[in-house]
């Protein structure tokens, strides 16, 4: 099997001529900090063991309260690399649960800033909420994500 030589050359050039590797390592350090601080500050939630990286499309980790779990829902903190955007998602624990909840929420009016999915069978969220924060300020990012998560969990009440 052959792979794209040009892309391999581009990758090598980026690694050799920029701080790409160090920058990505710093991002991972920041994202792990975000997860660990949220877990410490939100004891009523159970957190996924680590972070998941998805080939630089996005990185994420999920967590849930007992109420969310009982309703087959979870919260997901997501960093979308292409748009350089931090978001919190309310998602189903599986595609079936997500579609059921999307039907229930179809006519639900969401607070400003929240966006519901148009296609729950092909997206990984029911509702997403972008988080506006100075990303390198770890403590501010933790606080902003915590507020966003609480808002999204409150959508069900």
Predicted regions and their residues:
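Charge-rich, low-complexity N-terminal segments
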Residues: 1-59, 67
């Amino acid at each position: 099997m052959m792979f794209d030589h040009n892309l391999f050359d581009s990758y090598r050039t980026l690694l050799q001529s920029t701080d790409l590797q160090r920058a990505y390592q710093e991002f991972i350090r920041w994202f792990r900090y975000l997860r660990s601080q949220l877990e410490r500050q939100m004891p009523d939630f159970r957190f996924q063991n680590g972070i998941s990286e998805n080939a630089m499309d996005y990185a994420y980790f999920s967590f849930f309260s007992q109420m969310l779990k009982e309703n087959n829902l979870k919260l997901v903190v997501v960093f979308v690399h292409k748009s350089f955007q931090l978001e919190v998602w309310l998602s189903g624990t599986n595609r079936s649960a997500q579609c059921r909840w999307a039907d229930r929420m179809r006519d639900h009016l969401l607070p400003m800033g929240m966006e519901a999915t148009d296609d729950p069978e092909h997206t990984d969220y029911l509702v997403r909420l972008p988080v506006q924060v100075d990303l390198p300020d770890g403590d501010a990012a933790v606080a902003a994500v915590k507020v966003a998560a609480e808002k999204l969990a409150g959508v069900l009440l």
